Every structure is written in C-alpha cells, then in structure tokens.
Regions:
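Enzymes that bind and transform nitrogen-containing heteroaromatic metabolites
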Residues: 1-194
C-alpha cells in the first residue's frame, strides 16, 4: 500500500490441526507442495508482491540458510531472487549482526517499532512464519490481515498457531482458495471494534 499507512500481514502455513511446526520444531510438512505447479505459481506471485518481510529469529535463520544458496536459485529462481532482494526485518534479542542481504535487526521494543512503522507511509509488511512474533503483534492489535495456508496433514504434536493469546481476537474471512494439492488458503482481516 505505497503512499498510505502501512498494513501488517502474517502468512502462516499450518497443518490440519493448526500447527506451524511439528514436535521437533521442523516445518518440512509445509513444503510438500513444492512439486505442485499451481502451488509454486501461488508462492511465486506472493513473493513478487513486494513489501517488507519480517521474521523472528528461528524463521529468519531457516530462511537465511536457504534462499541465498545456489540450490534455492536453481530450484525456485523467481522466488529466490525476490526473497534475497526484498527488505527484511528480523526481531531477535540474541542475533548480533544479520548476514542475509537487506536485513534490519530489531533487538528491543518490537511492539513500539512496528507501531511506528505502521504509522509511516511505505510498503506493507508481511510476517512469514514466526509464531511468537505473530502472537505478540496480534495481542497488541497491530496485525491487520492473516493469511493461513492449511496443508492437508495432521501432525498430532508441535507448536500451534496463535497459542497463548490473552484474549479473543475477532477476524473476518475475506476470501478462500482451494488448490488441487489439497491445500486451502484463507484470508482474514482484523474485525474492527464496533
């Protein structure tokens, strides 16, 4: 949303039982669609949309270990190019100097930093994965939209999406898309108080 106030979105891939990571904190279940052309096109279109990417430390480390590699460039050239070129923010109290190109570190006052960024004009911000960051920013009512990609697998254990919210947060379903590989993407917007 260039020229206006920024919007903050979260994109999360979850299992049928609402988990974004399995019991070993792995997210490989979310990448079973890699060979599916329709899903690959959807992901490439998302990456081409631009904006600013935001991550927590764990997700950042996973992304930074994959996207800058020759293997990523060969497997998914369009997505790799965009992921490496886009501006990125990593929220971490332990990371001292991010190595991935175009990355800014936020080491304290995440809520205040995001609140200030949203009050400025500029490109929209999208959180990828990063469950604890999503929960913190949703609790502070800073997330405007949530995009949930449901993968057709039940994990039985692991980290659940939006776990630990101290109060209910109402969202409105805006649209859905069903993929031939069995995945479903749901787009929600935060419901404004009446």
């Amino acid at each position: 949303m260039e020229g206006g106030l920024r919007q903050l979105s979260a994109f999360m891939q979850v299992s049928l039982d609402g988990r974004f990571a399995d019991a070993a904190a792995e997210i490989s279940f979310a990448h079973q669609q890699a060979a599916d052309a329709e899903w690959h096109q959807f992901m490439a279109e998302n990456a081409a949309a631009g904006g600013v990417l935001m991550f927590g430390r764990i997700t950042y480390d996973l992304m930074a270990s994959w996207w800058p590699t020759p293997a990523a460039a060969k497997a998914m050239p369009e997505i790799a190019r965009q992921m490496n070129a886009l501006p990125k923010i990593v929220a971490s109290r332990t990371l001292s100097s991010p190595k991935w190109s175009n990355t800014t570190l936020v080491s304290r006052d995440l809520i205040g930093t995001v609140r200030r960024m949203k009050a400025e004009s500029g490109p929209d911000i999208t959180i990828l994965g990063s469950g604890s960051i999503v929960t913190q920013l949703a609790t502070a009512q800073l997330i405007d939209r949530i995009e949930v990609a449901v993968t057709p697998i039940a994990l039985g254990a692991g980290k659940t999406f939006l776990a630990g919210l101290p109060l209910p947060l109402p969202f409105t379903l805006k649209r859905t898309r069903v993929f031939d590989n069995g995945s479903v993407v749901l787009w929600y917007a935060r419901k404004e108080a009446a």
